[in-house]
Amino acid sequence: MPSKTSSRFANINPNVFVSTIMIIAIFLAIVILAPDAFELLTQQLKNWITESFSWFYVLSVAFFLIVLGYIACSSSGKIKLGPDHSQPDYSNSSWFAMLFTAGMGIGLMFFGIAEPIMHYVSPPSGEPETILAAQQSMRVTFFHWGLHAWGIYAIVALSLSYFAYRHDLPLKIRSSLYPLIGKKIYGPMGDAVDTFATIGTIFGVATTLGFGVTQISSGLNYLFGFEPTSFSKVVLIIIVSAMAALSVGLGLDKGVKRLAELNLVLAVTLLAFVFFTSATVYLLQTTIQNTGQYISNLFEMTFNLYAYQPNGWIGGWTIMYWAWWISWSPFVGMFIARVSRGRTIREFIIGVMLIPTGFTLIWMGFMGNAGLYSILHDGNLSLLNAVQRDSSVALFEFLHSLPFSGVMSLLATVLVVLFFVTSADSGALVVDYLTAKSEDSPVWQRLFWIVVMAGLAIILLLAGGLTALQSATIMSALPFTFIMLLICWGLIKALRIDSTKMQAIQEARTTPRAIQNPRSWQQRLGLIMHYPHSKVEVDAYIKKHVQRAFESLEREFKRRHLTVAISETDDGLQLKVDHHDEINFIYHVVSRETMPPSFMLEQEHNADVEKYFQAEVFLREGGQNYDVMDWTEEDLIQDIIDQYERHLYFLSVMRAQTGN
């Protein structure tokens, strides 16, 4: 009998889990023993990467956008992230709220006011502190927070959700490489990829926690006069982590989802307040103009490396942003994938790319232009000086110039805290997925990673290693960019196969045979109007008649030297024909609940008749939307052969295309 200790750790992937802990321990030891030398080394490496590989980042991010646009417009856009019959797990509003808060919600709070003013003071080109500099600052801010950022997230999220929900692979980064390395994803190579993604996620969240408490401290200092100290920042990290632990303990639906929805409501409230209490017409006009300039200059900005006027601006801003989004993409991409099951690929790309980007542009447009208006028209030099001195106070200094500044500063502080909580709890869920063998892990594993990230942030905060950690996180983006390019290759390859299968099946489509054996018309009518109210009746049919049909086919397939497996599932019976290196054939009969037709309700006048059950056919790609209940064994065998013939046609098309 296994011990309680062994069962408690049974769901841990030891290779990824232990490797992650060891790397974190080594990193902490270096930072604590030689903090100055390590910070200097990481800073120099970061500078070398941004100077030498800026062209590579620019081309890669542009390529990600092109790939997403191609997939969305192609026939692959109709493919679902899951079986063909699957439906979205979350409503559109809940889905968008979770995308927004996990992706960059906290960044908008930090940079919404500060970044446009920083570009206004120090633009990439031209004279600073002019009207042209103000226009350029908004255009650049839109560029950094717009389509490119969400394109990076979308590539990782799309690949993960496609392979996890469409092909039943683990929801892990390694699964994205399956078309390229096959079953090696389950070996050391896959463990290495997941370990790398885990380290990047932990470092990214820990950096956010460490630097984020600075903005929370600024809000508390403004509201209550609390002077920020190392002790107060440690206490804040502990409080935020405790709230994240509570959210994680409640789970994705009750905790993370509810918190994300609350965040979105409060963020919209703050944005509406700024819009109506600032220069409303000015904000509308400038935001619309900024959006037009952003769209019209999108291609130029995408490939602009400032090669003819070299300066450190692009490395300190655009390349830093691209590297930061890439380093966060395993974390955000996995979380987006986790909540996107059941959507079509086209719906997914449009949703992930356009909806959060639209909200981000509105937020940056209203907040950034409100800050610039305060400086340009109201002469608010204190805001300008505050941003130059400490960008974390920008939001609170701006709110000070508006009515009800105390109340709104309190709301802003609460929002910052909640955004940090959602980043921490989402990060813990993602790290838990990466280091566990399955998604059904105990709560203590998620809580453990909350403690690890909080402890890492506290130690580095006290030891002065947060800047080094931030540099290390950005540096990790370079090798992961190569992995993302491989992910694109594997995704396109898999989608091509899926699209070919859809086309081949369409070309070889046969109508379900239904009832072929001779029967009187009265018998046929009675059978097609038979709506079983009991699941037991359908289960009994599957266990008896479907089982016999499967066994008859099994004997014939084996006589022809094919490997066949019949297996019971939670909801039915499955027949699988093994084709070795090619895609296997699956015919699955499922006992499925469905709504009765309206005429049935009218005829029976029975309040209890709210549902009936059917024996629906599922193939590898999902439900086929026809019922085989009451078919004879011969009918079933003929239908299976029809479906198998379509599958063989698809395999022949694939062999012709690949030359095998």
Swiss-Prot record:
Phenotype upon loss of function: Deletion of the gene completely abolishes glycine betaine transport.
Subcellular location: Cell inner membrane
Main location: membrane
Pfam families tied to this protein: BCCT
Superkingdom, taxonomy of origin: Bacteria
Keywords: Cell inner membrane, Cell membrane, Membrane, Stress response, Transmembrane, Transmembrane helix, Transport
One Gene Ontology MF term: transmembrane transporter activity
Regulation: Uptake is activated by NaCl, KCl or mannose gradients across the cell membrane. Inhibited by the protonophore 3,3',4',5-tetrachlorosalicylanilide (TCS).
InterPro entries (UniProt xref): BCCT_CS, BCCT_transptr
Cytoplasmic-side positions: 1-13, 74-93, 161-195, 252-263, 338-347, 423-446, 493-660
Stretches that traverse the bilayer: 14-34, 53-73, 94-114, 140-160, 196-216, 231-251, 264-284, 317-337, 348-368, 402-422, 447-467, 472-492
Membrane topology: Multi-pass membrane protein
A GO term from the CC aspect: plasma membrane
Periplasmic side: 35-52, 115-139, 217-230, 285-316, 369-401, 468-471
Function summary: Energy-dependent uptake of glycine betaine in response to high salinity.
PANTHER family assigned: HIGH-AFFINITY CHOLINE TRANSPORT PROTEIN (PTHR30047:SF7), HIGH-AFFINITY CHOLINE TRANSPORT PROTEIN-RELATED (PTHR30047)
NCBIfam families (alphabetical): bcct, PRK09928.1
Family according to the record: Belongs to the BCCT transporter (TC 2.A.15) family.
The protein's name: Glycine betaine transporter
Naturally occurring in which organism (per UniProt): Acinetobacter baylyi (strain ATCC 33305 / BD413 / ADP1)
